[in-house]
């Protein structure tokens, strides 16, 4: 039986982090978690990390698509925070962001890690950006590192 799985070290990986400025007090913590994970666990150097800032979560897929189209990166981490309010706006923003990022991954055969918080309350978002429930930015970085390795392993085995 052949089992393909990745590890989390990716010293030579070139990673783009596309980050929303909206809810910046939360999203900056996600960025810190992602950067710490990439450097500490993945051994990714600062020179191989590019941070792209966009206004909000709706803009993440377009920026991710442009990054993917450049062909210069091994993976993308998308970071943002969408918190439910009193209108259906949350559903549209969260859904379109998720769908758009998934489309980029499939179109460009490139891992796109989803580190966008989609919570009902600000308290839930705070918990997920580095307090009680961990740091979802760091978790997205771990996922990306593993997927970069899985895809490289698949490419080697399938050629």
UniProtKB/Swiss-Prot annotation:
InterPro entries: LS, LS/RS, LS/RS_sf
Pfam families per the UniProt record, alphabetical: DMRL_synthase
Record has Glycoprotein as a keyword: no
Active site: 89
GO cellular component: cytosol; riboflavin synthase complex
One function term, GO molecular function aspect: 6,7-dimethyl-8-ribityllumazine synthase activity
Binding site for 5-amino-6-(D-ribitylamino)uracil: 22, 57-59, 81-83, 114
Amino acids binding (2S)-2-hydroxy-3-oxobutyl phosphate: 86-87, 128
Coiled coil: none
Gene Ontology terms: biological process: riboflavin biosynthetic process
UniProt keyword Transferase, yes or no: yes
Keywords: Riboflavin biosynthesis, Transferase
Pathway(s) served: Cofactor biosynthesis; riboflavin biosynthesis; riboflavin from 2-hydroxy-3-oxobutyl phosphate and 5-amino-6-(D-ribitylamino)uracil: step 1/2
Reaction(s) this enzyme catalyzes, per UniProt: (2S)-2-hydroxy-3-oxobutyl phosphate + 5-amino-6-(D-ribitylamino)uracil = 6,7-dimethyl-8-(1-D-ribityl)lumazine + phosphate + 2 H2O + H(+)
The enzyme's E.C. designation: 2.5.1.78
PANTHER family, sorted: 6,7-DIMETHYL-8-RIBITYLLUMAZINE SYNTHASE, 6,7-DIMETHYL-8-RIBITYLLUMAZINE SYNTHASE DMRL SYNTHASE LUMAZINE SYNTHASE
Family named by the database record: Belongs to the DMRL synthase family.
Job description of the protein: Catalyzes the formation of 6,7-dimethyl-8-ribityllumazine by condensation of 5-amino-6-(D-ribitylamino)uracil with 3,4-dihydroxy-2-butanone 4-phosphate. This is the penultimate step in the biosynthesis of riboflavin.
Self-association state and partner proteins as the record states: Forms an icosahedral capsid composed of 60 subunits, arranged as a dodecamer of pentamers.
Record's protein name: 6,7-dimethyl-8-ribityllumazine synthase
Protein source organism: Shewanella baltica (strain OS155 / ATCC BAA-1091)
């Amino acid at each position: 039986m052949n089992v393909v799985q990745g590890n989390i070290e990716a010293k030579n990986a070139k990673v783009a982090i596309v980050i929303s400025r909206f809810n910046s007090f939360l999203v900056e913590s996600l960025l810190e978690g992602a950067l710490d994970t990439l450097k500490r666990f993945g051994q990714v150097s600062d020179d191989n990390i590019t941070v792209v800032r966009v206004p909000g979560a709706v803009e993440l897929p377009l920026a991710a698509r442009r990054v993917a189209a450049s062909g210069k990166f091994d993976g993308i981490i998308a970071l943002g925070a969408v918190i439910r309010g009193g209108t259906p706006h949350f559903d549209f923003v969260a859904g379109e962001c998720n769908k758009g990022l998934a489309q980029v991954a499939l179109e460009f055969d490139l891992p796109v890690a989803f580190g966008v918080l989609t919570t009902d309350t600000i308290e839930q978002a705070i918990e997920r950006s580095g307090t009680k429930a961990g740091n979802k930015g760091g978790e997205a970085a771990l996922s990306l590192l593993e997927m970069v390795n899985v895809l490289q392993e698949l490419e080697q085995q399938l050629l």
